[in-house]
Swiss-Prot record:
It comes from Chlamydia trachomatis serovar D (strain ATCC VR-885 / DSM 19411 / UW-3/Cx). Keywords: Hydrolase. It catalyses: 6-phospho-D-glucono-1,5-lactone + H2O = 6-phospho-D-gluconate + H(+). This is 6-phosphogluconolactonase. Pathway: Carbohydrate degradation; pentose phosphate pathway; D-ribulose 5-phosphate from D-glucose 6-phosphate (oxidative stage): step 2/3. Its EC number is 3.1.1.31. GO terms for biological process: carbohydrate metabolic process; pentose-phosphate shunt. One of its GO terms (molecular function) is 6-phosphogluconolactonase activity. Belongs to the glucosamine/galactosamine-6-phosphate isomerase family. 6-phosphogluconolactonase subfamily. It is an enzyme of class 3 (hydrolase).
Length: 256
């Protein structure tokens, strides 16, 4: 049985009861969002997330490919990408496309971030402006790190303060790396924002989300707004029962 939590006006959480339910919810949400966009606007413009959890979701989506109304109408961008000598080994693009090739999305509708180009961020922003109507994605997938980062928007990095650019290179000193990432201005205007969290290693993060006083705001908490909240999908193992108990009863609802 999933639990719906209204954490605040900008963040709504759905906690799955099992790993299977987590993947089902994430998969059906993705497919229904795609079908709605294709029906209404003729295409589904999505920014994908890197990380292990999205790869599991992609596998489920491919299994349920028949439920997608028209895979040829999917247009794929990325939310962030590594920019170092190990990019091929750790590339979000390569890992995702190894799975998503099963959807047979036209190659000219898949836009990879070119992190080898010193002006690749400007070029990627231009691609978004050219191909995504009004630069509004139908969906942006958001992973969440233990430190509360999302995409490559890490705590105490300069990209957090970007007000105009849609794509930037972001120096991440805590990881000794440089990443290309979408920024808040374009992410916040997406039609559907979804954050995915699973694993016991995220329990401390969930505790801090539930108890926000006395700490800095996490990057992921700066994404949603009351007019466009982030929908979180969490697995039960990412939340301690004691923290769930601390959430007021009128903010929780057992769904199904």
């Amino acid at each position: 049985m999933a639990t719906l939590i209204s954490l605040n006006d900008a963040n709504r959480m759905l906690i799955a009861d099992s790993q299977e339910e987590f993947l089902q919810i994430a998969c059906y949400d993705w497919i229904s969002t795609a079908n709605k966009a294709i029906h209404k606007r003729g295409a589904f413009y999505v920014a994908l997330s890197g990380g292990k959890t999205p790869l599991q979701i992609f596998q489920e989506i491919v299994k349920k490919r028949a439920a997608i109304s028209d895979c040829s109408k999917i247009v794929v961008f990325w939310g962030d990408e590594r920019a170092n000598e190990d990019v091929e080994a750790g590339s979000n693009y390569l890992k995702a496309m190894d799975i998503l090739k099963g959807l047979r999305i036209p190659e000219d509708q898949i836009f990879r971030m070119d992190t080898a180009d010193p002006k690749g961020d400007e070029a990627y922003e231009a691609l978004i402006q050219k191909y995504v109507p009004d630069a509004i994605f139908d969906m942006v997938m958001l992973g969440v790190g233990e430190d509360g980062h999302t995409l490559s928007l890490f705590p105490e990095t300069h990209a957090l303060e970007e007000k105009e650019r849609f794509v930037v290179f972001n120096e991440v000193p805590q990881l000794h790396t440089r990443r290309m990432t979408l920024t808040f201005p374009i992410v916040r205007q997406a039609r559907h924002l979804v954050a995915y969290v699973q694993g016991e290693n995220k329990q401390d993060l969930f505790h801090k989300l539930v108890h926000p006083l006395g700490r800095d705001t996490f990057p992921i908490e700066r994404v949603g707004t009351p007019l466009n909240p982030v929908q979180w999908v969490l697995s039960s193992d990412s939340c301690r029962k004691t923290d769930l108990a601390d959430i007021p009863a009128d903010c929780k609802l057992e769904m199904f």
